Amino acid sequence: MEQLTHHAPWVKWIPVQADSGAFFYNIPLERLQNFKCDEILCLYQSLSGQPFDKEPYFQHTSFDQYKYIKAGVPFLNKWKLAECIVRDSDREQAMYDKVVTNEHYVVTHLNASHSTAGFDSSIIPEDWQIIPITSDGYIFDWLKVIEGAESIIMTDSVMSNLVDQLNIGTDRYYIPLNHIQLTPVFGNDWTWLDNPNINPNVKIFRSS
């Protein structure tokens, strides 16, 4: 909550306490109704007990495309993130000074909410520093570190979306983690790597 208000102060952020399930939908809906909002849009692609999968585009779009269609917003606006956030150069510099010790370095982010991606690390030069993005600080604190990297290696996460939406770097590597509906649409060039840790069930099409 704190980092959201710090970097997107134009949004009225409403905290909701996590519980056994109602916080996903019922409580947020009630809070918004109490604020007498003119329009309430639920951007969940799927949620138990809710008919979101009945939308005609559900079976044919990725999760991020689904949200933009639902909201009636052009999908290309996904890459206008820079216009929507306020960067904090002091926090970014502090993170840079804390983690960067070699001018030649690669930034990695391999941990997702439910899995850790793998890759052949021999592609990284031995004299380069490897900087894994951690939960330290705000996610936006890492922007200067990422911008200074000679290579970026990431899996399906908020960080890879951030890099793509802000078009950071040119030598970018993406490690897939989910099936096509839960994989984000990227607008910039990435080299895709095999993920030895991927769940085989996420593969929709298989060769015999």
Report each predicted region and the residues it spans.
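Catalytic machinery of carbohydrate-active enzymes
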Residues: M1-S208
